[in-house]
Amino acid sequence: MSLMHRVGWRRGVVVLAVTVLLTVVVIQLLSDEPEIALVIGEPYEAMRQRSSASIGPAIPGHAWFSIPESDARLRFIDPKYGFVTPLARFFTIGFDDELIDGVRMSPQIEPLLLDDTLKVVLNLQEQWRKAGWTPIRVNEDPPFADTPEWRARLRDVSKGGTSYWHAEDKYQVMLVVHRFKDNKRPTEERYLITLALATPWTNP
């Protein structure tokens, strides 16, 4: 083997090793994001053992809620209707007699600009559509869209928007967006997203 061939072979090995290392690092970084992995109706302790985010135990015989000890994303693990949210700072998991009965969260770690807000809600809606969720009450509360009409509605502090989705008769999601006065950025339009997940509480 000539010197040039040896140099080229070694260079190829180095490039391959660096590529593999970078891939591993990216996967590790993504998997290091704390998450709460659950499905409505399951034992609370099963969620605790499965989740990478730390969260306290349920209170036997009580209906209450718990909060993760760090920012965390929700991974809803129903085999058909599953979805994943961005990291959340406000995140509560409701339980009744040690069974999970609902989630209420804001899938963001700070108030967002309108463009970023729409990216989050449209991504969630797209996940739901692909998984077979169906928007309900669309005449009164249509799904969010990136249109001039929707942007004007969200900018109106007296309006905002709400969208409801059903997964057959198993689950319901409510998604709410409204303007938020952010004292850290008083000159910017910022928005809060609220997501509620439980068994259906309204009719289609």
Q: Which ranges hold each PLM region?
A:
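N-terminal leader/targeting segments
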Residues: 10-15, 19-99, 106-107
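Long, continuous compositionally biased terminal/linker segments
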Residues: 58-61, 66-96, 148-204
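Short, Lys/Arg-rich N-terminal segment immediately upstream of the first membrane anchor
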Residues: 1-9
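Generic detector of well-ordered alpha-helical segments enriched in charged/polar residues
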Residues: 37, 41, 122-125, 174
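Long, charged/polar, surface-exposed segments that mediate recognition or autoinhibition
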Residues: 89-160
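Generic alpha-helix signal with a bias toward terminal, lower-confidence helices
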Residues: 15, 50-52, 56, 95, ...
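A general, composition-driven signal for non-globular sequence regions
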Residues: 4-5, 22, 144
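Amphipathic alpha-helical interaction segments
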Residues: 52, 72-73, 136, 141, ...
